[in-house]
Design a protein with these regions (language model features):
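Sec/SRP-type N-terminal targeting helices
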Residues: 1-59
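Charged, solvent-exposed structural "stalk/scaffold" segments
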Residues: 39-91, 104-105
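A sequence-composition feature that detects small, non-aromatic residues
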Residues: 6-11, 45-46, 78, 88, ...
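Acidic, low-complexity, intrinsically disordered peripheral segments
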Residues: 19, 88-115
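Short flexible/disordered coil segments
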Residues: 24-35, 85-100
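Secondary-structure boundary/capping residues
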Residues: 31, 70, 112-115
Length: 115
């Protein structure tokens, strides 16, 4: 019986160590996901600024096109640049939302439960 008690104590200690390891892993995962979320928000803001710049560039290009100072190819390039910057914003929003949902799931704010 002394052996059983000793084995039980060792098993309990092993379980406690595993529990602590899991808690550290979860905590690190949450911290990493939060940092990733902050980075995606920064990227989103940068992409929003890029849209403003692209819109200003397009507006100037449109004026110059109307005045006949640039070719239709240059005008089309400005259109494409504006479209690409708007697409990049949408992609950044999507990425930020995915990371936000992952963070909420990790912190228990949302659960994957079917009702």
């Amino acid at each position: 019986t002394k052996t059983r008690v000793a084995n039980a104590k060792i098993a309990l200690e092993n379980q406690e160590i595993l529990k602590e390891e899991q808690l550290v892993t979860i905590e690190n995962t949450i911290k990493n996901t939060y940092e990733l979320y902050q980075n995606t928000l920064f990227i989103l803001e940068a992409q929003n600024q890029n849209v403003i710049t692209s819109q200003n560039n397009f507006d100037r290009t449109q004026e110059r096109f109307t005045l006949g100072q640039i070719t239709s190819i240059e005008f089309r390039l400005a259109q494409i640049n504006l479209l690409n910057s708007k697409t990049a914003v949408n992609n950044a929003k999507y990425d930020a939302k995915l990371i936000e949902l992952e963070l909420l799931q990790l912190t228990g704010e949302i659960l994957n439960i079917a009702f």
